[in-house]
Amino acid sequence: MIQKLLMLFLLLVCCLCQAQNKYVLTADSKKKVGVEYGEHIYARFDKSVVFPGTIREVDIYVPAQYDGKTPACVCVFQDGMSYRADTVVSNLISSKEIPMMILVAASPGQVIGDFDPDSPRANRTYEYDTPSPRFGQFVLEELLPFVESLKTSEGKSIILSKNKNDRMITGCSSGAACAFNVAWNTEEFTRVYSSCGSLTGLRGSFTNSTLVHKFEPKPIRFYFQSGSHDMWTSFGDWWSANQAMVRAMDFAGYDFTYQFTENADHCDDNVTQLFPDAMRFLWKGYPGNSPSPKRKHIILC
């Protein structure tokens, strides 16, 4: 009897170990000897016309190698800086695997409460999950110009390229839905890292995979990530929603890749582990343009 209980205990331990992923970060996500790292600039933006009354915190990472004179590529993050991106980007710039790039991260907007200023109203799902050009307008017309109005501690100007081929956007969960919505609706970003994208019934982003099926392909390169333990709520199944998007991308002939990780949870460390490879994929062949997709199927109307 004791032997059977021991075997049952060991089996349970093995199952639990298999269910918990331990993500090992590569050297690309760690500080390296001989690589110069840049600085963060923190600011608050509260002058939005696109989203009136909102305030948000902005975090800009400027690599040490940036000269303050040449327009730099830009990567825009939702929900603040993540993925150990500052370290990864400086490492990959140093190894000449990606171009000079400035990182711009902003928190979702908050609106100060009329009756209780200490309890602001969160604007996140309204801004991120709504499939419209509005957040893209905010990024292009307000956020990026605001970033360019700032300077580094050494007095260097921040000059961001206006070429869509030099722009990337990323996020996790609703931030990933936002990244897709911005790239799709503005056509001013050509590289997207989407992790655990909320392509579900929060505010309509579940329609995005259908749009990919129906519309002419756009010159955007995508990297998708999700996991078998991603969210599953009354708004939908994140795992299957991301699979549907990948199927749509394949149908339409996009240049994309994906990583669906067994047992990965919603926005866990898997998204950080994959970020260096995502950057390599999204920026491969630069300064060449992201290729225009070749539709695999002809639709007769």
Residue spans of the language-model regions?
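Glutamine-centric residue-chemistry signal
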Residues: 3, 18-20
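Non-catalytic cap/lid and distal C-terminal segments of serine-dependent acyl enzymes
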Residues: 20-301
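Hydrophobic h-region of N-terminal signal peptides that target proteins for export
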Residues: 10-18
